[in-house]
Amino acid sequence: MIKVENLSKSFDGVQVLKDISVTYEQGKCNMIIGASGSGKTVLLKNLIGLMEPDSGEIIYGDRSLSRMDENQKRQLRQNIGILFQGSALFDFATVIENVMFPMEFFTDWSPAQRRERAQYCLEKVNVIGSDGKYPNELSGGMQKRIGIARAIALNPKFLFCDEPNSGLDPYTSILIDRLISDLTKEFNMTTVVNTHDMNSILEIGDRIGFIHQGRMLWQGDKKTILQPDCTELKDFVCAN
């Protein structure tokens, strides 16, 4: 579980996040939704430690991120998997080398152990027989699957996905959504997904938080989002 308490962030005097409070639950897909420029990407970057908030707390389990020492932060990073918007695969590395990459930094496993774990992760995302291929030889959907395999390589407790459907056709988007949801439940991860895709929200949104102009205006689930008591959210739903 991750708790966010009264989080605020500004850039050049402009407040981008305003007193955000939200809880992200374990074993569920927790969605951060909102229009472009609403602040959802800034919130995601604060959650994973790429930015520091001006005020407020981010609590992983029972430990505040701001109060962790460097050793504790390193331990936390080992428990975080990230699926970047563009998959962020290394073009110079093969599929299996991409998946093994985080293991080289955070484990003392032998090359054989790393390869075995990478193959297991690739099987989990239904990528078989592509170990020696390079990312540019694969479709966007396959690249996304490999990105997910790399994100779960260290068996993380927390999974963050930034616009996982970006650049995908509707059918492939559904498959990727279901894969993220299935892995979340199988490994009991706390998964946080940043998206503006309504199909994705309705497909896997166990918990949903709507951000508008830096404020968390509404929280609910996929059962209640189509009849919200929030005018700004109604506009967002109609536009998407």
Tell where the protein language model's regions lie, with residue ranges.
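Helix-to-loop junction immediately C-terminal to a conserved catalytic motif
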Residues: 48
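Conserved ABC transporter NBD signature motif
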Residues: 56-64
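Conserved ABC ATPase "signature" region
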Residues: 64, 111-129
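Conserved ABC ATPase signature
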Residues: 134-138, 142
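A short, proline-enriched helix->beta-strand linker immediately N-terminal to the Walker B motif
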Residues: 153-157
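Catalytic Walker B motif of ABC-type/P-loop ATPase nucleotide-binding domains
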Residues: 159-162
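Helix N-cap at the start of a conserved alpha-helix in ABC-type nucleotide-binding domains
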Residues: 170-172
